[in-house]
């Protein structure tokens, strides 16, 4: 099994840090400090070495230290392809982000070729009651760990969708180019939808197989394209192309694409109660979310033989003793690099003896 883990992390002008240097190894790491000390900022910096905008989905301008024009995050990381140096830097003046792998520029969506990562934050605990966009992105991040090419597909789809919207809204009369774009969107949509469905099948099996202290969930996806595939419809690409063609006039008025895999919703049910997670208590929602993360970690390791980095922000807060102890035993048993934030060690004293403590 390959372990993805950080050997070192360096921050320059990042959030509240002027300069920070951390040396780590493939063990659990506990970041301990008062609220506002920068614990979550460190997790966010690590999460930037995975496709997307990090665990906060922050705008570039917000990650640079106040009054500074640039910031830099550097990591020496044991990746899928071996030991490598990764950097990502931002310039407030140009609003650009540049990511490099061993001093060669790479696209953000290429990061899943090198790294594997899972995170759980307090913000995510509201994912079941927030908009479908957050749940869909959560599902797609899960897919990245099973299929690294999925990130590139999602990025390409969003690019072509933006181009289509621009042509329609600006009334650019180029039917041939529009047709080509819609055909590309349709082909990519087919791959995205199939990847999601395959991953959901893996995940459901993982949830059903894993006996633990957290509630089991039933996972599904509510999307026209995914449903057509499940129903056995043939010529999916042609179907999507036709739908995009038929909605041109409507989308021109709306200024956006009203049909496609970007409208799908990731649905989660409490298995025992047979109700959607959004109708469960906040405590149950957190427990269900943890159960999904555990299943993802467990099955990703079994299926891909790769142990991802796990980032847990204040995850032990409000967990009862039984669930907290189970979670600690489960995670330490996976033999992976685990980053945990906390304001104190109450309830996790034994876990702390096996971890690297970093006080902020």
Curated annotation (Swiss-Prot):
It is found in: Cytoplasm. Its main location: cytoplasm. The keyword Metal-binding does not apply. GO terms for molecular function: ATP binding; single-stranded DNA binding. GO terms for biological process: DNA replication; DNA synthesis involved in DNA repair; double-strand break repair; SOS response. Keywords: ATP-binding, Cytoplasm, DNA damage, DNA repair, DNA replication, DNA-binding, Nucleotide-binding, SOS response. InterPro entries: DNA-binding_RecF (IPR001238), DNA-binding_RecF_CS (IPR018078), P-loop_NTPase (IPR027417), RecF/RecN/SMC_N (IPR003395), RecF_2 (IPR042174). ATP binds at residues 33-40. GO terms for cellular component: cytoplasm. The keyword Repeat does not apply. Belongs to the RecF family. The RecF protein is involved in DNA metabolism; it is required for DNA replication and normal SOS inducibility. RecF binds preferentially to single-stranded, linear DNA. It also seems to bind ATP. This is DNA replication and repair protein RecF.
């Amino acid at each position: 099994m390959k372990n993805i883990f950080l050997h070192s992390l360096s921050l320059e002008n990042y959030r509240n840090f002027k300069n920070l240097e951390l040396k780590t190894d493939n063990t659990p790491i506990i970041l301990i400090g008062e609220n506002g000390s920068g614990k979550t900022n460190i997790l966010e910096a690590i999460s930037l070495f995975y496709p997307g905008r990090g665990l906060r989905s922050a705008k570039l301008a917000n990650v640079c230290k106040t009054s500074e024009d640039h910031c830099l995050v550097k990591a020496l990381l044991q990746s899928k392809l071996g030991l490598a140096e990764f950097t990502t830097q931002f310039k407030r003046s140009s609003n650009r982000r540049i990511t490099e792998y061993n001093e060669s520029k790479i696209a953000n969506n290429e990061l899943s070729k090198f790294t594997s990562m899972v995170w759980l934050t307090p913000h995510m605990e509201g994912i079941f009651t927030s908009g479908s966009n957050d749940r869909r992105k959560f599902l797609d991040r899960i897919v990245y760990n099973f299929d690294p090419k999925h990130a590139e597909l999602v990025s390409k789809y969003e690019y072509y969708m933006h181009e289509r919207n621009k042509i329609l809204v600006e009334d650019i009369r180029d039917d041939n180019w529009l047709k080509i774009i819609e055909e590309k969107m349709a082909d990519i949509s087919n791959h995205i939808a199939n990847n999601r469905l395959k991953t959901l099948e893996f995940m459901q099996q993982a949830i059903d197989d894993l006996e633990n202290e957290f509630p089991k969930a039933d996972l599904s996806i509510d999307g026209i394209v995914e449903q057509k595939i499940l129903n056995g419809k043939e010529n999916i690409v042609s179907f999507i192309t036709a739908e995009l063609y038929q909605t041109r006039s409507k989308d021109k008025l709306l200024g956006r694409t009203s049909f496609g895999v970007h409208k799908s919703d990731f649905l989660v049910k409490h298995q025992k109660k047979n109700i959607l997670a959004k109708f469960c208590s906040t405590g149950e929602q957190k427990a269900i979310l943890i159960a999904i993360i555990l299943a993802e970690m467990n099955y990703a390791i079994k299926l891909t033989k790769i142990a991802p980095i796990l980032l847990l922000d204040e995850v032990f807060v409000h967990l009862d003793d039984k669930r907290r102890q189970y979670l600690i035993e489960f995670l330490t048993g996976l033999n992976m690099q685990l980053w945990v934030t906390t304001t104190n060690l109450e309830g996790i004293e034994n876990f702390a003896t096996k971890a690297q403590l970093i006080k902020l």
